[in-house]
Regions:
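Surface-exposed binding/hinge segments that line
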Residues: 120-163
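Gly/Pro-rich hinge or "lid" segments in bacterial periplasmic/extracellular proteins
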Residues: 69, 153-203, 207, 216-217, ...
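A bilobed periplasmic-binding-protein/Venus flytrap-type ligand-binding module shared by bacterial periplasmic
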Residues: 193-198, 256-286, 293, 302, ...
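A structural "hinge/loop" feature
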Residues: 36-52, 73-76, 101, 149-156, ...
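N-terminal lobe/hinge region of extracytoplasmic solute-binding protein
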Residues: 34-82, 90, 113, 174
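Aromatic- and charge-enriched surface segment that lines or borders ligand/interaction sites
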Residues: 77-119, 133, 139, 221, ...
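Ligand-site clamp/hinge motif
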Residues: 196-240, 380, 389-391
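Detector for C-terminal structural segments
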Residues: 29, 39, 185, 189, ...
Length: 527
């Protein structure tokens, strides 16, 4: 696979950078980055900016280590009650926001109560109320136990009760994160400087400058030395690793790709008037045959140039994954046998047919993403030998949304929160936004999902989450309902200045800014 960058694109990239109002050089004090799309919604944690990624300008109450254990820069103690419906939090003394004003229990209570009322992207789950008992102590009440509430504590950035204004905060945030905003020029750049009041570990970079460039322009700028950190597509990494004066980083990620199948027969519509169901994928034999026919290792090697690992669940590499979920894929003969046994016979056109219905499917994916396009084309080629014809269609998410309930659809997910399993498979989540678009429903699986949520702690929930895949009789995986064909986890790849050390952190998630999860550990290694 080759990537060509024209002289014109490189010139445009360099011209754009030259036009910016700050020096472009990377030093021990300043680091210039192009790691993702512009956060067009601004920087309000109530809205859940940047696809759930690390809150650069804010601090949540908890953070995750590389091994997914929890620690806190802001709390000296945090404990759920035995029944799991109350959390007692104790703040460390003398915490401050980035403007030097005190951060107290009043701010924590305000943040949580306001996030629950605002209807933003932050899923507050069973949250009921937060009360400031005094300056250092907060009591959070839940409507019911929720093992995943620890992830809420680890994602919602704290804002000031006295200075929060929902009309202006997204563009003029005051937080308690590792950096504070200097300036934001929409469409061009975001400049932040180190927060002198940050309660966590400070890295070596006093200033970060984020520029918003497309992949081609960012790659060209990295080669010219004008950017210190650039996120690049995995397919580009094979070329980039041989470039002089840059360092290639490959980061473990839980960002995945998978195909969701419509699980019910056609004939219904949702409240938006979109079709639900597909008579072909409603047959479990079709779903299992596709799962067996796909060679995940081949996809990882040929489409992602090896910068991906095969995945058989949507939570590969996480504690709640079921390690026995893997199976021998790329097995064309087994896939054919499954279809034969289910009555799907080859017709004169070489397409499987059953009761007058041909196995012709349309796979939808979002346009503008070369990786999804290449994956879709490869998937079509891999299922053709078993007699399934797969056409490809792409469009914006608004377009895909109209067809994802009635056609197999290529999705990307990946979170460190096991709540994602609930969103994929709970009948209560069916058709809610992009959750459970296939309208999967299995009462036995639902019981495991609810038991996982009801567990007092996330550790006690793990066996219940694992049972969602397969409990010996039921499950969402290949042994059970084969609700998805999960494909791979995509590793995140970056080019940096040779002097930049990106440190270590928890596995990166789906989202372009997730590299910042490890920002506290970044270093400048040159004198």
């Amino acid at each position: 696979m080759s990537i060509r960058f024209s002289w014109r694109k490189s010139f445009i990239a360099l011209s754009c950078l030259a036009a910016l109002s700050v020096p472009v050089t990377t030093s021990a004090q300043t680091l210039k980055l192009a790691i993702g799309e512009e956060p067009t919604e601004g920087f309000d944690p109530m809205l859940g900016w940047s696809h759930g990624s690390y809150l650069l300008l804010h601090s949540p109450l908890l953070k995750q280590n590389a091994d997914l254990s929890w620690y806190s820069n802001m709390l000296s103690d945090y404990q759920p009650s035995a029944e799991g419906t109350t959390w007692k939090l104790t703040l460390k003394p003398d915490l401050k926001f980035s403007d030097g004003s005190p951060l107290t229990a009043k701010d924590v209570a305000f943040t949580y109560n306001n996030a629950a009322a605002s209807g933003g992207k932050v899923d507050m789950g069973n949250f009921l109320s937060a009360t400031a008992d005094d300056d250092l102590h907060v009591t959070i009440a839940l409507k019911a136990p929720q093992s995943t509430f620890v992830n809420v504590l680890g994602s919602l950035g704290i804002v000031s009760a006295d200075k929060y204004d929902e009309k202006t905060y997204a563009q003029k945030p005051i937080g308690a994160g590792p950096y504070r905003m200097v300036s934001f020029q929409p469409g061009q750049q975001l400049i932040v400087e180190a927060n002198p009041y940050y309660a966590g570990k400070k890295n070596d970079f006093e200033k970060l400058i984020f520029v918003f460039l497309d992949e081609d322009a960012a790659f060209a700028a990295a080669q010219s030395g004008q950017l210190g950190v650039v996120r690049i597509p995995p397919a580009t990494a094979a070329i980039a690793k041989n470039l002089p004066n840059v360092k290639l980083w490959e980061r473990a990620s839980v960002e995945n790709r998978g195909i969701v199948f419509p699980m019910v027969k056609s004939g219904e519509k949702n409240t938006q008037g979109y079709d639900i169901g597909n008579d072909i994928t409603a047959d479990i034999a079709i779903r299992k045959a596709i799962n067996y026919a796909l060679n995940r290792q081949l996809l990882a090697e040929q489409v992602l140039d090896g910068y991906a690992v095969p995945a058989y669940t949507g939570v590969k590499g996480l504690p709640w994954d079921q390690t026995e979920a893997a199976f021998k894929d790329g097995d064309i003969e087994k896939a054919k046998q499954i279809l034969d046994d289910a009555g799907w016979k080859l017709n004169k056109n070489g397409i499987r047919e059953k009761d007058g219905l041909e196995a012709k499917l349309t796979l939808w994916y979002t346009s503008g993403d070369a990786t999804r396009r290449d994956l879709a084309e490869s998937i079509r080629a891999l299922v053709q030998p078993i007699g399934i014809q797969m056409d490809l269609k792409s469009g914006s998410w608004d377009t895909v949304e109209r067809y994802m309930h009635s056609n197999p659809t290529l999705f990307g997910w990946g979170s460190l929160d096991p709540m994602e399993l609930y969103h994929h498979y709970s009948m209560n989540a069916a058709g809610v936004g992009y959750y459970n678009p296939g309208y999967y429903k299995n009462p036995a699986v639902e019981k495991h999902l609810q038991a996982a949520l009801d567990a007092p702690t996330w550790q006690q929930a793990v066996p219940h989450w694992q049972a969602v895949e397969w409990d010996g009789k039921n499950g969402v995986g290949i042994k059970g309902d084969a609700a998805w064909a999960w494909l791979m986890n995509i590793q995140h790849t970056y080019l940096t200045d040779p002097c930049v050390d990106l440190g270590t952190g928890a596995p990166e998630i789906h989202g372009s800014w997730s590299l910042l999860n490890s920002v506290d550990t970044w270093k400048w290694t040159c004198q």
